A protein has these predicted regions:
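Glycine-rich phosphate-binding loops that contact phosphosugars or nucleotide phosphates
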Residues: 126-134, 140-253
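Mixed-charge, polar/low-complexity N-terminal
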Residues: 9-11, 181
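Extended, charge-enriched "interface" segments that sit outside catalytic cores
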Residues: 4-9, 16-29, 33-140
């Protein structure tokens, strides 16, 4: 990063930023009546208007030069193609693969990983449909009314964001809860709201070694087993989202 901010193009951008600050947005529109058209983009239902920002054609040219200087285009292509962009773990990132269409195909290490990804997505959809249709029921036969996510960091914020973003479309018969720390107050407050007989717990941990998540899962599982002693009951009320299925099975899920 230090080399980047010392580069000539970065210095040019810095000077340009100081210069453009002296101009008001209204002046930029007076100077160029076509400004709104030049500094806006549209794609299907999306429309982006950045004409009301301190940006000129020179700004875009300088930013493009900066992108070229760090091979941004090639880095984006590497990310999308499954190249090893995570130098620490020597792994591809593949975030974008989760959103690739089923028929696209993405070969990584000689295998089409989209086949595996869409198999997991299909499994998720089937599970959701079972819950929505009341086919997935608790051990006692009662329908699921509450879903609790146990996770921390991205394993908490990701699902939480999805629930908030899709709130207008959610199944009104379901309530969602999130436990992300080991605070007794949060757990006790949750236990006052839910009924084990109608609750589905989702333990979310990529490695299935996250201390806080497993501690909460252990506490809840212990309380659950005090009420339901049959081992089969766990399958109706606990799920794991993880890359380490073996560890989840060892845990008892």
């Amino acid at each position: 990063m230090s080399a980047l901010i010392k580069s000539p193009i970065w210095q040019d951008l810095t000077q340009h930023a100081l210069s453009i600050k002296k101009q008001s947005i209204s002046e930029l529109f007076i100077d160029d009546p076509e400004r709104c058209k030049k500094f806006s983009l549209s794609e299907q239902a999306l429309y982006l208007d950045y004409s009301k920002n301190p940006v000129t054609l020179q700004t875009l040219q300088l930013l493009a030069q900066l992108a070229d200087s760090v091979a941004l285009k090639q880095r984006i292509q590497a990310l999308f193609s499954g190249a090893l962009v995570n130098s620490t773990q020597q792994l591809p990132a593949l975030h974008t693969a989760l959103r690739d269409p089923r028929k696209t195909g993405l070969i990584v290490n000689g295998k089409d990983i989209l086949t595996k990804i869409h198999a997991a997505l299909d499994k998720m959809q089937h599970l959701v449909e079972q819950i929505h249709n009341n086919h997935w029921r608790g051990f006692s036969g009662k329908k699921i009314t509450d879903i609790v996510n146990l996770g921390i960091g991205g394993s908490d914020l990701g699902p939480l964001m999805a629930v908030h973003a899709l709130k207008a479309h959610h199944q009104s018969t379901l309530r969602f809860h999130f436990i992300s720390n080991v605070d007794d107050k949060a757990l006790c407050a949750l236990l006052e709201k839910i009924n084990f007989a109608t609750t589905l717990f989702i333990i979310t941990s990529k490695s299935f070694t996250t201390l806080e998540t497993l501690l909460n899962a252990t506490r809840i599982l212990k309380l659950f087993q005090e009420k339901y002693t049959q081992p089969a009951a766990i399958k109706s009320h606990f799920l794991a989202v993880t890359c380490q299925a073996e560890k989840a099975i060892e845990f008892g899920i």
